[in-house]
């Protein structure tokens, strides 16, 4: 069985939530009375996996998600699987099946139908193999949920390290995951699109709408 490390990068400022009056760190904001990060951890941790939340208390302020992950690289088995999950999403899926599918290729990415301009998007062929990933540009109706699996952690980490060393920055000048994935695609890695119903909790409005659906 593939050893899997789960990493939840959570060193961002959560600026939109703080501007809306939230006084706790974004990962600790309650979602139906349960901290956001706790819900994500319970949802994305495969059987037998080791999970880490990489927050500012561990790595300090960082320059984007890739930077956060690389600063915690010592926690990751480079020859095992790596599952990365952003803290502001909820996906309706069976995580063990997701990992199983990812292991038939070089990895897999959770996707869902959307046209929101603040997300990343992919193109995929008829077999579900991703051919392109673009950040903050609606190039298809297949959005990235924020959950990624790589069969060999080393391959993603090598790509992430190259992006940072070459100072290839994305949205708001940050080192973003989509850049590392785009590099992997250019180098011939096969990553699969795994469709699943997804709720994005990236803004206060997203959170309020989600909680309203469950409490009204």
Language model regions located:
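Short glycine-/acidic-enriched loop or helix-start segments at secondary-structure transitions
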Residues: 18-19, 40, 93-96, 119-120, ...
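Catalytic-core segments of class I nucleotidyltransferases/pyrophosphorylases
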Residues: 99-100, 129-216
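A generic secondary-structure signal
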Residues: 43, 71-75, 183
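N-terminal glycine-rich phosphate-binding loop and ensuing alpha1 helix
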Residues: 1-56
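Residues at the starts of beta-strands that form the adenosine-phosphate
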Residues: 3-5, 49-52, 81, 106-107, ...
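Fold-independent oxyanion-binding glycine-rich loops
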Residues: 10-11, 55-57, 86-88, 112-114, ...
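Well-ordered alpha-helical segments embedded in enzymatic catalytic cores
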Residues: 36-39, 68-71, 180
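Conserved beta-loop-beta/alpha segment of the NTase-like Rossmann-fold superfamily
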Residues: 57-124
């Amino acid at each position: 069985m593939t050893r899997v490390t789960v990493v939840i990068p959570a060193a961002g400022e959560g600026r939109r939530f703080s501007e809306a009056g939230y006084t706790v760190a974004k990962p600790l904001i309650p979602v139906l009375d349960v901290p956001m990060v706790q819900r994500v951890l319970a949802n994305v941790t495969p059987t037998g996996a080791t999970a880490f939340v990489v927050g500012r208390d561990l790595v300090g302020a960082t320059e984007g998600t890739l930077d956060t992950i690389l600063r915690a690289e010592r926690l990751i088995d480079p020859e095992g699987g790596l599952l990365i999950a952003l803290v502001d999403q909820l996906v309706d899926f069976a995580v063990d099946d997701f990992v199983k599918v990812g292991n038939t290729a070089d990895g897999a990415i959770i996707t869902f139908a959307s046209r929101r301009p603040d997300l990343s998007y992919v193109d995929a062929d008829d077999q579900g193999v991703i051919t392109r990933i673009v950040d903050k540009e609606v190039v298809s109706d297949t959005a990235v949920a924020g959950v990624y699996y790589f069969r060999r952690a080393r391959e993603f980490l090598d790509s992430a390290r190259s992006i940072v060393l070459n100072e290839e920055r994305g949205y708001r000048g940050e080192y973003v995951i989509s850049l590392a994935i785009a590099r992997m695609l250019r180098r011939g890695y096969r990553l699969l699109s795994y469709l699943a119903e997804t709720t994005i909790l990236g803004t206060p409005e997203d959170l309020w709408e989600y909680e309203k659906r469950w409490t009204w």
